[in-house]
């Protein structure tokens, strides 16, 4: 009797596993177009949920590709300078966490008007383009820019930091 029960449990388990693996396969009854459409919906949901607050802010702003590239340059240089011991004291308040940098940049930008953001990005791009010919000048500019952004990691007022940046860059 015990053997019969054990064999029955094993068979039930094997059937259950087989049914689960069949569910994982795409339904052959559906045409390819509807399967592709279904996959797109799932991918969009996943991507939307992965968007950072900075990405969400950028999507709400009317930034052109050049401005988006400049913002990416700025964010990446701040992440790069995070490990530099010569950067400002408050910059280290991020605790070495790169996500804190994006969070701080997002907070800083969200307190500014769209035209102020565009002006700032245009000025950064203009100076970056001038300095790009000489790697040493570009690195110096990156350090100056990172030092100028030191105030956003001290929870300083965005307008104050913006005015300081205008003088710096």
UniProtKB/Swiss-Prot annotation:
Keywords, sorted A to Z: Cell outer membrane, Membrane, Plasmid
Main location, first listed in the record: membrane
GO cellular component annotations of the record: cell outer membrane; membrane
Localization terms from the record: Cell outer membrane
Domain of life: Bacteria
Membrane disposition: Peripheral membrane protein
Name this polypeptide is given: Putative outer membrane protein BBA03
Organism annotation: Borreliella burgdorferi (strain ATCC 35210 / DSM 4680 / CIP 102532 / B31)
């Amino acid at each position: 009797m015990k053997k019969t029960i054990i064999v029955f449990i094993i068979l039930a388990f094997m059937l259950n596993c087989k049914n689960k693996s069949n569910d994982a396969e795409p339904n052959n009854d559906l045409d390819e177009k509807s399967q592709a459409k279904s996959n797109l919906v799932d991918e969009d949901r996943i991507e939307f949920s992965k968007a950072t607050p900075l990405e969400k802010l950028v999507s709400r702003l009317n930034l052109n590709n050049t401005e988006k590239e400049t913002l990416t340059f700025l964010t990446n240089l701040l992440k790069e300078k995070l490990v530099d011991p010569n950067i400002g004291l408050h910059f280290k308040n991020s605790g070495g966490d790169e996500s804190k940098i994006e969070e701080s940049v997002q907070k800083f930008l969200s307190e500014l008007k769209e035209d102020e953001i565009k002006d700032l990005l245009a000025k950064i791009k203009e100076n970056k383009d001038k300095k790009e010919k000489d790697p040493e000048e570009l690195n110096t500019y990156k350090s100056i820019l990172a030092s100028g952004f030191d105030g956003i990691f001290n929870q300083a007022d965005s307008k104050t930091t913006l005015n300081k940046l205008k003088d710096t860059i």
